[in-house]
Swiss-Prot record:
Keywords: DNA-binding, Nucleus. It is found in: Nucleus. The gene is TGA1B. Residues 18-45, 88-125 have a biased composition (Polar residues). This is TGACG-sequence-specific DNA-binding protein TGA-1B. InterPro entries: bZIP (IPR004827), bZIP_sf (IPR046347). Residues 185-216 are annotated as: Basic motif. Binds specifically to the DNA sequence 5'-TGACG-3'. Coiled coil: none annotated. Residues 1-125 are annotated as: Disordered. The lineage of its organism: Eukaryota, Viridiplantae, Streptophyta, Embryophyta, Tracheophyta.
Length: 242
């Protein structure tokens, strides 16, 4: 009732305290906080409140912030205009009312914005982290698949090389076996030819020896026959002479 907050709240929400009543002056003199006249105190309180709320006051009418700062610095006896430390019940009621009004003027600050935006930021960061983890997992899976494919290719190439080497070895072994068989056959043929040659030679020798024996027998028979012929011729001659 003793403090009238004047000001156009729709225009800027500025609170101006009218301290022209004598009761408020007495309470301010008793509390040693407000030591100025009603006109100067109203302008100073409005300037301090406007500086605290960072809202231009209607009394300034577009004046520079430096003027308001100088006026606030000149009036050091007012104390801190943000909180009215009045010991009287009237001033305490007015201070509570002013604090309630100032608390009612809820201007969105950067901290509130950051508080409201922090869950979204955390959600976005969590989503980004999950996406990055998924991308990393996909990259790891791709690398694992590549490594597995390379290992499979290496294993298949090694298996094919081993198969080729085994086939070559088997072919060499077969060729060696074939060559060995051919060599054995050739050796067997040579042995047979040698044996047959020896047998043929022996047969020839036996045959020649038999022929020589027969020739000798024929010569002996011829000589015997010649002797008999000569004897017969001699007997014929003797018979003719008789």
């Amino acid at each position: 009732e003793f403090c009238d907050f004047s000001g156009n709240q729709a225009a800027g929400g500025v609170m101006v305290m009218d301290t022209s009543s004598p009761e408020l002056r007495q309470s301010s003199s008793g509390s040693d906080v407000l030591n100025a006249t009603s006109s100067t105190s109203s302008h100073q309180v409005s300037g301090d409140v406007a500086g605290y709320l960072n809202v231009p006051s209607p009394e300034s009418n577009g004046s520079n912030h430096e003027g308001s700062r100088e006026s606030a610095n000149d009036n050091k006896g007012l104390g801190d205009a943000r909180v009215l430390n009045c010991h009287s019940p009237e001033s305490q009621g007015s201070g509570n009312y002013g604090s309630n009004v100032s608390e009612g003027l809820n201007y969105p600050s950067d901290s509130n914005k950051s508080v409201h935006s922090s869950p979204n930021f955390e959600n976005n960061s969590i989503k980004n982290g999950a996406v990055e983890e998924k991308i990393k997992l996909e990259g790891v899976n791709a690398n694992i698949s590549k490594c597995s494919s390379l290992l499979k290719r290496k294993k298949s190439s090694e298996d094919s090389n081993n198969i080729n080497i085994h086939q070559k070895l088997t072919n060499v072994a077969l060729s060696d076996n074939v060559n060995n068989d051919e060599d054995e056959k050739k050796r067997a043929r040579l042995v047979r030819n040698r044996e047959s040659a020896q047998l043929s030679r022996q047969r020839k020798k036996h045959y020649v020896e038999e022929l020589e024996d027969k020739v000798r027998i024929m010569h002996s028979t011829i000589q015997d026959l010649n002797a008999k012929v000569a004897y017969i011729i001699a007997e014929n001659a003797t018979l003719k002479t008789q």
